[in-house]
Every structure is written in structure tokens, then in C-alpha cells.
Curated annotation (Swiss-Prot):
Its cofactor is pyridoxal 5'-phosphate. CDD domains: GDC-P (cd00613). This is Glycine dehydrogenase (decarboxylating). The lineage of its organism: Bacteria, Pseudomonadati, Pseudomonadota, Gammaproteobacteria, Lysobacterales. The keyword Oxidoreductase applies. The glycine cleavage system is composed of four proteins: P, T, L and H. One of its GO terms (cellular component) is glycine cleavage complex. One of its GO terms (molecular function) is glycine dehydrogenase (decarboxylating) activity. Pfam families: GcvP2_C, GDC-P. It comes from Stenotrophomonas maltophilia (strain R551-3). The gene is gcvP. Its EC number is 1.4.4.2.
Length: 955
């Protein structure tokens, strides 16, 4: 072979995906390194990362493989799962995902690559979809307001418990729980209640009548299918100053009286059966709806209606001062990431079917259940009454029934030795009920029983009220109409399919198509979370493999994949620390040190674990103040439980003293929690578990490529050292020292293939290179923008980690232009803004990630330089201080094409500040949204159609 002939191994090109994932090619990397003054990526990394923490050896992971190879490997894993028809219920039900929704939302990067809608003007499409979701939930539950999703039904029930505690007049510490709630809900309530000093009492509705409690949780219909009349009980709880929360089923509420109509104060549930597959437990969009009086205490994000600068209706995140990143240690919930993508799917399922279609599905499901119940009773089998879709069958040999059912291709619910549950759903057919009946030795003539069998719902609890009367739920019922509606919404937004999203602390990197493909395979999507273990062997292999990958990347010893958001991972880590101290007889350790530069969820999570937060200082360079930590560690030595720190810091720097900080905390008996939000600066370079940290949460929706989905889903694994491993979250049915933190034992399991695929395709060298290029891209931006915007904090050698904070505050003094004006002006250039005023007010935090090409980085830099020139023009008097393109940004097509233009600058500067924008231009659908108006006039449901009508034209 001649020297110029490549080897077969080179031609096989196993690292092809690495080159697809990383934006700049090697020649561009060399060019960028020249700009920042380093000869190689390794030399740059040596200059950025403290020597004390650098990993001495490469990651012990396989080499990179191609997309084709990775898909073949994960196909072999998926094939080890066994897909039966699951009639297990317990909060999870079969559903048909309409193909138009599957292809155009779940599989569409315009929807799944978007970020949380903090920038309202470029998020109008998904916020309209979320308003639809809120309207759906509020209408069906009979409540006045609903939020834009929560993580799962059990978490939502726990949030309802704490909302009731905050809001009830009763001073009791007892929360009464219906003994027929779903088991996973009860498990999670136990986890949440104990650290907060809440006493749980579990019992029957009759016992609840006499109980002194601040709140009551009912399940309606209950976990065994029973539909009860709770009006008298609700009145009794209210008379004692308590609040009533109800966990419910949205499909059932198309037929049953809404909880709000019989007195409920808070209603929670899961929208999963509105078109979202089982997915072995998630992700699914839960919800909370409540009385208007409690809206300012409600957890989760809330979409509201405001007006824009032209007075037109516009959506925005409303009442944001409720949220954990603002309230910090005063927060009562740490909800951050929720389940926006799944909420959008559920809302569009309702839009597509409309109220009549939903009612038809519910009636069909109930009719099939009624016919099956009649057949079983006719054969002498005992079946409970007053049900919607779930039959509680008693007096049978359960083990024998389950064996026969599985042989016939069905899973039924395991309850105890002499009873089983059967939950029917949208997917159930005539053939299914015939087959299930035969398992019990019953035969049936479907049509004959249909004609002779009455419905099984109590007449006094049938729904009389209308729901989903807004035109959006009564218009888009043909596929063409829904397809075009979805396209119109997507076109209003900026997602990663159109532009870089340089949000600091958010890691908006490529979500590769190959990574996404396995998510919708039936072998992953159609597995109920409670199937027998031998039907989920593929999931076990996937989970074990991914946990081992994450252990290697982090240097910890064990990982739990149960937490279904970063905030839940934080909570799990702190629960592990708390349980560890208690296991050693040190229950008194309750102080958590948190630097003031920490992630906003940190103090909220600590508070939820019953810890008291002590905030420590940062120095003038943005570093954690080691001496202040030392002083506080000594001051609270006997009570010190933990420190929570983000590394690299939220200020975008690698702090030199991280090892010393760990030693200080350990000396005083505490544990070190390292927030993994910025792990994208560490993978393959340094491992927190090796420099003294005891626990971290990771964000698979940041570092490991699960898409953000417009505000969820996410996965927040909790990684720990060996001594904390016994205190990771328990699984359903376990009785260990720590309970569940999510409804499903493995959280949002169906999206785990995404991260597995990413790690497999990148390999050990690719993962390290991704980290290095993420650092390079951030430093390239900081260096090129240095003559125009100061980078607020830098680390050793004047370099940043993987993100940089641009300081706009000095310019506000000279020009009147603030960070928000810059953020809004970037929209005119087709960019999503960087993170605004976090972690430092008046700044912009930029994180480009490794996936952005040199072309895209330069496009962003050119936009920022042009904005700086406009600010200079204001400073020089060439542009008016009040009437300028920054103060009036963003500019809509309607505004710049209006017959009258009254501004003191030309239309072309407003619309096309750079020539390149004439070739490709994003037009925001609304002008700047009025935040103050939105918070003063809270409206969180679909906008009435007449609000969009133009004023009548005078004749």
C-alpha cells in the first residue's frame, strides 16, 4: 500500500458522526485557536482547566461508531423488550398518537429543539399550543386556571399537597390521602411529606370525614376504577378550613362531572392518554388546575395573555416571580423543566378530536368496559360497579389469570393474590374484550351484550356542562387543517432548526436525528412501566449500559436515572445526603451552604429537603469566596449538611480552589453537591467524582443531547459516590431509606436512547473533543467581541469555560440601552437571545456549544457588533435616545410595511440591519410584549376570537 492510500479502517470512517455533531471542522478549529492565541485544543484546555482536577487518562469508553452501527446496536437492545397489549392502567393507558401529530410535533425539530419560552416574541407558536393545553385542563376539570404542565401525576399530587399547606386556613400538619390513590402517587407523597414536616394519614373517604387535616387528596375515578360521590366529604373538609385536591383522568371527565363542579380546590392528573405513548413511564405531561385564588402560589410555568407594543394580543410567561429561579430559597417548589413537548402533543390531540371526538373515544372505552364486565358477571366472576374504564375483578386465582392473559398477549394489573385489574383504553377493540373474557372462562356476543347492558357510571355524576367550546377545538379536525395549523404555529417560533440558541447555562446543542429515531419504536414506546421484568429486558440493558457510561463520564460510583428533570436530580441528591446523615445518627445536620452565583433551583431544592440555606459570597472576579465558605463551615460545623456549588461556576469560569472547598466541607462533616448543569465543559476533561465531590445531578437534556422540547422533557440523573449509593431514589414497591422522586421507577425512560446513542456515536475521543470545542467556541466569541462588549468574568489566563457573560451595564449609563433591548434587537437579526440578566442583572450570558459552526458563530458576532454600532450611534446622538431600533425591537413585518412610518430611523435599519438578512429573514409575529400589563391582567386561557378582529374600517 502506498503512503497516499488510506487504510480500510480510515475509509470505514467510524468517527463520521463526531464530525457531524461538532460544528467547526479541523481547519476552522485551527483558525479559531489562532484568534484566542493557542496552538492546539489540548494547549487551550491546559490553559483553562485547573491541573488539580484534570483527568489523567482518557474515558474508558469504546471508540466512536457510525450512525448505522449505533442504530443496529440499539435495535438489538430494543428487540429484547416484549410488546404485549397492556391493560394495567394505574395512571398509564394505551392511546393512538395521530400520525399528523407524531410526524409534525414529536418528530419535528421545529418543536422539539425549541427552548423554554422566556423570550415571548419568538415563542408565540408554542405558547399558543400551551394556552390550548391550559384551556383543555381547566375546562375538563371545571377549574378557573391551569398551568403549562408538570413532570408527572405523582409529582403534581405532591405539589398539590404543598400548595394546600401554603393556602389552607387550617393549621393542621396532617394531609389526608384517599387509600385508593395510585400506589406511585402515595409513594411520592411520602417522599415529599416527611422532610417538610407534613404528616400523611391514609384512609377511606369515610375516615376522612372526621379527620383534622389541612388538605385531602382524592382519586377520581380511583385506582381500582371506582367512581365515587365526594360532595359531602368536600364540604366537611372545607368546613374545617382544609383544601381538597383531586387526582383525575381527563378522558373520564368528558363523561363525569368535573371536580370543580363538586367543590375541588386543586385538580391534578396526567394527560398521557391524549396521544402520548406509555414509554415505560415517561415522559408525559401532568397538569395542575386550581381556583383563581391560588394562581400566585401555583407551581410550574403559566402562559398568559398580554399585549404587544402595538396593542395586539400576545402570549407570555406570566407571574414569573412565582418561579424558583427568582424566589430561590423562598421558593416552595423547584419545578423548572416540565413537559412542554408532551403538553403540546396532548393539546393538539384535543384540537384534532375536538369535544365530540374525545367524548366518542370515552364512550367507546366505557362501552367496551361495560360489555366486558357484563360478560364476566354472567360467567360468575365478581366485578366492581360504578366505573369508567377500569374493572376490579375479585375472587379469582390471580397468578393463574395473569399467566393465561400473558399467553393470550395481554398484561393485566397485579393487585393481590385473588384480584386483578383490567383498564381498557382508546386502543381496545371488540377482539380484545373477547380475548380477555376468555381468560376468565367467559364467552360473549359483543353486539348482544351491547344491546342489553347499561352504562356503569352513576347517573348523579354524569357531566352536564359543556367543555372545549373555543373555536380552536372545533375547527382543525381534518388532517390538512391540523397540518397547516401546526405549521403556522411553528413558523412563529425560533428553534434550533433555524438558528443558534446561545443561551448560557442551557447547552443548546445538536439533537441529532439518529439519536431521536429509536424513541418512537414500539419496542420502546409501547411498554407500560409496570410490565413484568421479563418483558423489559431491553430497557434493563439500556438503563444499565447508560448508567455505566455516566459513571465513567463523572467519576462517581452509582447513578439513578429516575429523576425526570434537573431539579428532581438535585432533590434526589440532597435527599441522599440527608438520609446519609440520618443513617449516622446526625439528624441535626440541616445547613446547606449555597454560593450566591448558584443555579436558581439549588436553594429551592434545599428548602424542599428541610434544609436551611446559608448563602455565601462570590469575589469580585466571580469566583466562590473560599474564605467565606471556610467561615460559614466553621460557624455551622455541627449542623453542616452540604454545600451546593455549580462547576464550572454559573459565572462561566473554572474556579481554582474547588478541591480545597471539598476538603473544607468534608472536614466539618458535610457533603459536597456539584450541580451538573455545566457538565458540557467537563466530559472527557475532568470528573467531579474524582476531585472530592460526593454527588451531582446531570442534565441529559443539556450535556447528553436530549432535546429541550420548548420546556421539557428532561432527565436529571443523580450520580453519587459509593457511600451515598444506598440512598438513591427507591423504586415502586421498595422499602428502602429513600422513596421515589418520580412517578415511574426509571423516570422518562423512553428518551434515554437519545443519550445512549450520543455517547455511543461520539466515543471517548469524540466526547473529549466536544468539550474542548465548546470551550473554544465560547472563548472565540468572547475574544472577538472584546473590543465591543466586556466579558464580565474570566478564569486563569483570561479565558472562560464554555460560556461567557457579556456586560451591558456600562452602556446603559451612556446610551439608555439595557440588556433586554439588546436581547430584543437580536430577534431582528434572527437570533434567540442569550440568557438575560442571569446570573448577573443587566448582562447577557452566551453559551454557543460545540455544535455551532464557525459560520454561525461569526453571524452572531456580526449581529452583536452591529448592535454595538447602533448603541454608539445613540451615544453620539446619531440615533435618538428614546426612538431607536433597540428600544423599539423587535420589528414586525406589519410595522415596517405600514403605510405610515413615524420613527426617527429608516425602515431598512429596522428590518435589515445587515445585508445578509435580505436573503433569509425571520419576522417575529408580535412586537415587544408588555410584561407589566400581563401580570396586572392575568388571563391564561385561549384568546376570544373577537380579540383578533381589526377595528371596523370607516366607510
Amino acid at each position: 500500500m502506498s503512503q497516499n492510500t488510506p487504510s480500510l479502517r480510515e475509509l470505514e470512517h467510524h468517527s463520521a458522526f463526531v464530525e457531524r455533531h461538532i460544528g467547526p471542522n479541523d481547519a476552522e478549529i485551527a483558525q479559531m485557536l489562532g484568534v484566542i492565541g493557542h496552538a492546539s485544543l489540548d494547549a487551550m484546555t491546559d490553559a483553562i482547566v485547573p491541573a488539580k482536577i484534570k483527568s489523567p487518562a482518557p474515558l474508558a469508553l469504546p471508540e466512536s461508531i457510525t450512525e448505522v452501527q449505533a442504530l443496529a446496536k440499539i435495535r438489538a437492545i430494543a428487540d429484547k423488550n416484549t410488546v404485549l397489549r397492556s391493560f394495567i392502567g394505574q395512571g398509564y393507558y394505551g392511546t393512538h398518537t395521530p400520525n399528523v401529530i407524531l410526524r409534525n410535533i414529536l418528530e419535528n425539530p421545529a418543536w422539539y429543539t425549541a427552548y423554554t419560552p422566556y423570550q415571548a416574541e419568538i415563542s408565540q407558536g408554542r405558547m399558543e399550543a400551551l394556552i390550548n393545553f391550559q384551556t383543555l385542563c381547566a375546562d375538563l376539570t371545571g377549574m378557573e386556571i391551569a398551568n403549562a404542565s408538570l413532570l408527572d401525576e405523582a409529582t403534581a399530587a405532591a405539589e398539590a399537597m404543598t400548595l394546600a399547606k401554603r393556602s389552607a386556613k387550617s393549621k393542621s400538619d396532617t394531609f389526608f390521602v384517599h387509600d385508593a390513590v395510585h400506589p406511585q402517587t402515595l409513594e411520592l407523597l411520602r417522599t415529599r411529606a416527611e422532610p417538610m414536616g407534613i404528616v400523611l394519614r391514609v384512609g377511606t373517604p369515610a375516615e376522612a370525614l372526621e379527620a383534622d387535616s389541612f388538605g385531602l387528596l382524592l382519586q377520581y375515578p380511583d385506582t381500582f376504577g371506582q367512581v365515587g360521590d365526594y360532595k359531602a366529604l368536600v364540604d366537611a373538609v372545607h368546613a374545617r378550613g382544609g383544601l381538597v385536591a383531586v387526582a383525575t383522568d381527563l378522558l373520564a371527565l368528558t363523561l363525569l362531572a368535573a371536580p370543580g363542579e363538586w367543590g375541588a380546590d386543586i385538580v391534578v392528573g396526567n394527560s398521557q392518554r391524549f396521544g402520548v405513548p406509555f414509554g415505560f413511564g415517561g415522559p408525559h405531561a401532568a397538569f395542575m388546575a386550581c381556583r383563581d385564588a391560588y394562581k400566585r402560589s401555583m407551581p410550574g410555568r403559566l402562559i398568559g395573555v398580554s399585549i404587544d407594543a402595538q396593542g395586539n394580543p400576545a402570549y407570555r410567561l406570566t407571574l414569573q416571580t412565582r418561579e424558583q429561579h427568582i424566589r430561590r430559597e423562598k421558593a416552595t417548589s423547584n419545578i423548572c423543566t416540565a413537559q412542554v413537548l408532551l403538553a403540546v402533543m396532548a393539546s393538539m390531540y384535543a384540537v384534532y378530536h375536538g369535544p365530540e371526538g374525545l367524548t366518542r373515544i370515552a364512550r367507546r372505552t366505557h362501552r367496551l368496559a361495560s360489555i366486558l364486565a357484563a360478560a364476566l358477571r354472567k360467567a360468575g366472576v365478581q366485578v366492581g360497579g360504578d366505573f369508567f374504564d377500569t374493572l376490579h375483578v375479585t375472587g379469582v386465582h390471580a397468578e393463574e389469570i395473569h399467566a393465561k392473559a400473558r399467553a393470550a398477549g395481554y398484561n393485566l394489573r397485579a393487585i393481590d393474590s385473588d384480584s386483578v385489574g383490567i383498564s381498557l383504553d382508546e386502543t381496545t377493540t371488540r377482539a380484545d374484550i373477547v380475548a380477555v373474557a376468555s381468560v376468565f372462562g367467559a364467552s360473549l356476543d359483543v353486539d348482544a351484550l351491547d344491546a342489553s347492558t347499561a352504562d356503569a357510571l352513576p347517573a348523579g355524576l354524569l357531566r352536564q356542562s359543556e367543555f372545549l367550546t373555543h373555536p380552536v377545538f372545533n375547527t382543525h379536525h381534518s388532517e390538512h387543517e391540523l397540518l397547516r395549523y401546526l405549521r403556522s404555529l411553528a413558523d412563529k417560533d425560533l428553534a434550533m432548526d433555524r438558528t443558534m440558541i446561545p443561551l448560557g447555562s442551557c447547552t443548546m446543542k445538536l439533537n441529532a436525528t439518529a439519536e431521536m429515531i429509536p424513541v418512537t419504536w414500539p419496542e420502546f414506546s409501547q411498554i407500560h412501566p409496570l410490565v413484568p421484568a421479563d418483558q423489559a429486558l431491553g430497557y434493563k440493558e439500556l438503563i444499565d449500559s447508560l448508567e455505566a457510561m455516566l459513571v465513567e463520564c463523572t467519576g462517581y460510583d452509582a447513578v439513578s436515572l429516575q429523576p425526570n428533570s434537573g431539579a428532581q436530580g438535585e432533590y434526589a441528591g440532597l435527599l441522599a445526603i440527608r438520609a446519609y446523615h440520618r443513617s449516622r445518627g446526625e439528624d441535626h445536620r440541616d445547613i446547606c451552604l449555597i454560593p450566591d452565583s448558584a443555579h436558581g433551583t439549588n436553594p429551592a431544592s434545599a428548602q424542599m429537603c428541610g434544609m436551611k440555606v446559608v448563602v455565601t459570597k462570590t469575589d469580585a472576579n466571580g469566583n466562590v469566596d473560599v474564605e467565606d465558605i471556610r467561615l460559614n463551615a466553621e460557624k455551622y460545623s455541627d449542623r453542616l449538611a452540604a454545600i451546593m456549588m455549580t462547576y464550572p461556576s454559573t459565572h462561566g469560569v473554572f474556579e481554582e480552589e474547588v478541591v480545597e472547598i471539598c476538603e473544607i466541607i468534608h472536614k466539618h462533616g458535610g457533603q459536597v453537591y456539584t450541580d451538573g448543569a455545566n457538565m458540557n465543559a467537563l466530559v472527557g476533561v475532568a470528573k467531579p467524582g474524582k476531585w472530592g465531590s460526593d454527588v451531582s445531578h446531570l442534565n441529559l437534556h443539556k450535556t447528553f443531547c436530549i432535546p429541550h422540547g420548548g420546556g421539557g422533557p428532561g432527565v436529571g440523573p443523580c450520580a453519587v459516590k459509593e457511600h451515598l449509593a444506598p440512598f438513591l431514589p427507591g423504586k415502586l414497591g421498595d422499602h428502602g431509606p429513600v422513596g421515589m422522586v418520580s412517578a415511574a421507577s426509571f423516570g422518562s425512560a423512553s428518551i434515554l436512547p437519545i443519550s445512549w446513542m450520543y455517547i455511543a456515536m461520539m466515543g471517548t475521543e469524540g466526547l473529549r473533543k466536544a468539550t474542548q470545542v465548546a470551550q473554544l467556541n465560547a472563548n472565540y466569541i468572547a475574544k472577538r467581541l472584546a473590543p465591543h462588549f466586556k466579558t464580565l468574568y474570566t478564569g486563569r489566563n483570561g479565558l472562560v469555560a464554555h460560556e461567557c457573560i457579556l456586560d451591558v451595564r456600562p452602556l446603559e449609563k451612556t446610551s439608555g440601552i439595557g440588556a433586554e433591548d439588546v436581547a430584543k434587537r437580536l430577534i431582528d437579526f434572527g437570533f434567540h437571545a442569550p440568557t438575560l440578566s442571569f446570573p448577573v442583572a443587566g448582562t447577557l450570558m452566551v453559551e454557543p456549544t460545540e455544535s455551532e459552526s464557525l459560520h454561525e458563530l461569526d453571524r452572531f458576532i456580526d449581529a452583536m457588533i452591529q448592535i454595538r454600532e447602533e448603541i454608539t450611534a445613540i451615544e453620539d446622538g446619531r440615533l435618538d435616545r428614546e426612538d431607536n431600533p433597540l428600544k423599539n425591537a423587535p420589528h414586525t413585518a406589519t410595522a415596517v410595511t405600514a403605510s405610515e412610518w413615524t420613527h426617527a430611523y429608516p425602515r431598512e435599519l429596522a428590518a435589515f440591519p445587515l445585508p445578509s438578512l435580505k436573503l433569509q429573514k425571520y419576522w417575529p409575529p408580535v412586537a415587544r410584549v408588555d410584561n407589566v400589563y400581563g401580570d396586572k391582567n392575568v388571563m391564561c386561557a385561549c384568546i376570544p376570537v373577537d380579540a383578533y378582529k381589526d377595528d371596523e374600517v370607516e366607510a
